[in-house]
Every structure is written in C-alpha cells, then in structure tokens.
Design a protein with these regions (language model features):
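Class I S-adenosyl-L-methionine
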Residues: 1-196
Length: 196
C-alpha cells in the first residue's frame, strides 16, 4: 500500500498563463486579481496561516528527497504583486492570476506575530519541518527578511525554501542573498531568473 502525500493527485496541463494588460487595475495598483474574499488580515485567521503542503498539488505533505527527506512541509501565501517588486518578470502573467482559491495573507502588522505563533506551535509538535516561502507573493521588507533570520535562530527545526524576484542590488534582495549565503543549510531561497 502506498501513502498519498498530496491531496490532489491528478495533474492537469495549466495551459497558457493568464496575462494582464499593462493598464489592468491589478497591474497598475499592484494587487491580486482575487482580493474579494481571498485576501485576509492574519488577525482574522481562524486557522494557521502556515498550511500543510498536502493542500498544494505541486508541493505535497513531506519532503521526498535530499537532506530534508521526511520533513513535513507547510506553505505561506501572501498577496501577489502587493509584496513583489515591479521588476518581476511575471508581474503581468503571475500564475496567481489563475489561482482563485488560495487565501492570500496581507502583509500587515498582524502577519509577523501570527506567523511566530504558528511556528511556535509547529516547533512544539514537530522536531524538523519546512516552510515553503511563498506560494504567491514575496518578501515585502528588509525587516520581514530579518524576522525569518530571527526565527531560524529561535526554532532549530525550522527549514525554509522558496524563490524571490528581489534581485541582488536591492535592499531586500541583498538581505535575502546574505541570509541564503550564511544559512543555506536551512534557508534555501533562490533568486528567480538569476543565481541563488
């Protein structure tokens, strides 16, 4: 008997990306297409903002290979475009344009304390775990990057992987690159369309 590690086992061709026009309101304002009912402040989180990768067809519940094999995966989804650099190559054709179901968490004053509580809960229950940053969205400030560095110090079982559109040479990009260089064993975040 095999164990299914994904909630969704059928993979369908995603087709062509849905590309916004330059003058589309979401492109101009830097927001998600799905703000109504899908964008929430963490202060209203009735459940965790870090959710099992089991709910994502591309990620799955547990790491299957490598040094983190066997570690459960949790994901964080922020609002695309609102947290991303306008220089992102996928500003208009972000795959979030076709993702109407995920809840996007606002980068507001309640997000960091809520993530901290979620991490504390996970650390009490699970010796080693992985956070996939970010299914949608990106690092939105240097302070936010530094907070992840502090959480790495606080929670020895925390491991992080993901991608960022923030390029080296920007304040946020340099913060991410430095953290990845110094803590690659637990902070494996790569720069999209560029070197790690």
């Amino acid at each position: 008997m095999t164990t299914v590690l994904r909630r969704f086992t059928d993979h369908k061709d995603a087709g062509e990306p849905y590309k916004l026009e330059q003058d589309h309101l979401a492109a101009r304002l830097g927001t998600s297409l799905f703000r109504d009912g899908r964008l929430r402040s963490a202060k209203f989180a009735d459940k965790a903002v870090l959710v099992s990768g089991h709910n994502n067809r591309k990620i799955g519940a547990v790491i299957q290979k490598g040094k983190w094999k066997g570690y459960p995966v949790f994901t964080l989804t922020l609002e695309e475009r609102a947290t991303c650099p306008r220089s992102c190559l996928h500003w208009l054709d972000c795959y979030g344009n076709k993702m109407n179901w995920p809840t996007r968490w606002m980068a507001d004053d309640d997000l960091i304390p809520t993530i901290g509580r979620n991490l504390s809960d996970l650390a009490r229950e699970i010796p080693n775990f992985v956070i996939r940053l970010h299914v949608l969205g990106d690092f939105y400030s240097v302070a936010y990057v530094r907070q992840w560095a502090a959480w790495l110090d606080e929670f020895s079982g925390l491991h992080i992987y993901g991608y960022t559109a923030w390029q080296p040479g920007t304040a946020i990009g340099d913060s991410i690159s430095t953290l990845a260089r110094d803590r690659w064993d637990r902070f494996a975040v790569r720069t999209s369309n560029g070197a790690a």
